[in-house]
């Protein structure tokens, strides 16, 4: 319980520090998630990104590299998936301009059927994506939803390739093979 209380306190403090340094964050996130049905969930993802980013920049040493998994740009793909039938990262230009730009963005991709199999193997039933507001009418299967999400992720990587280096990894091999691609 003590760890949970301390973690909550530090994360809250990190979030407030991030917002203080990025005063447009709250308005921008509220604007981009507004069209979605699951606005609280999307806002929570963006808050999580801000907390982890701020915690990282405030603790990383001068000789260290801050490496974040599932952060602002990853969550931008979630926002695109949830808010648009035809995802276009330019629709989130204000969001991507507000988000800290990484020196390198690693875009990891795998075929949709492999992603769903991995989700199921981890105990996830793969239903997170098909629960999007428009998913009931739009998708005939979880694979169709997964493919749309893959496309949103690829579009975000392509969009950000204009302002930063993007490393693309085809995640079809072993962990060692995929790691070697990044190195």
Could you describe each region identified by the protein language model?
Residues 54-57, 94-97, 156-157:
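Short, flexible, glycine/charge-rich loop motifs used to bind or transfer phosphoryl groups or to couple energy/partner
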Residues 58-62, 98-100, 161:
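Flexible, charged surface loops at secondary-structure boundaries
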Residues 81-95:
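Substrate-gripping "pore-loop 1 plus following alpha2 helix"
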Residues 44-51, 87-88, 141-152:
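Soluble or luminal CAZymes and related metallo-dependent hydrolases
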Residues 1-83:
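ATP-dependent small-molecule kinase phosphotransfer cores
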Residues 64, 70-71, 91, 98-122:
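Conserved phosphate-donor/acceptor-positioning beta-strand/loop module used by diverse small-molecule
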């Amino acid at each position: 319980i003590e760890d949970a209380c301390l973690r909550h306190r530090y994360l809250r403090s990190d979030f407030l520090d991030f917002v203080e340094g990025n005063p447009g964050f709250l308005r921008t996130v509220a604007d981009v998630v507004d069209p979605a049905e699951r606005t609280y969930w999307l806002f929570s993802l963006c808050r999580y990104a801000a907390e982890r980013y701020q915690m990282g920049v405030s603790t990383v040493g001068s000789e260290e590299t801050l490496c974040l998994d599932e952060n602002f740009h990853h969550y931008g793909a979630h926002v695109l998936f949830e808010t648009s039938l035809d995802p276009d990262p330019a629709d989130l230009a204000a969001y991507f301009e507000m988000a800290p730009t990484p020196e390198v963005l690693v875009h990891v991709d795998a075929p949709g059927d492999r992603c769903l199999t991995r989700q199921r193997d981890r105990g996830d039933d793969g239903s997170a994506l098909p629960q999007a507001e428009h998913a009931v009418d739009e998708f005939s299967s979880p694979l169709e939803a997964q493919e749309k999400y893959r496309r949103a992720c690829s579009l975000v990587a392509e969009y950000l390739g204009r302002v930063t280096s993007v490393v693309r990894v085809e995640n079809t091999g072993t962990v060692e093979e995929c790691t070697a691609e990044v190195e």
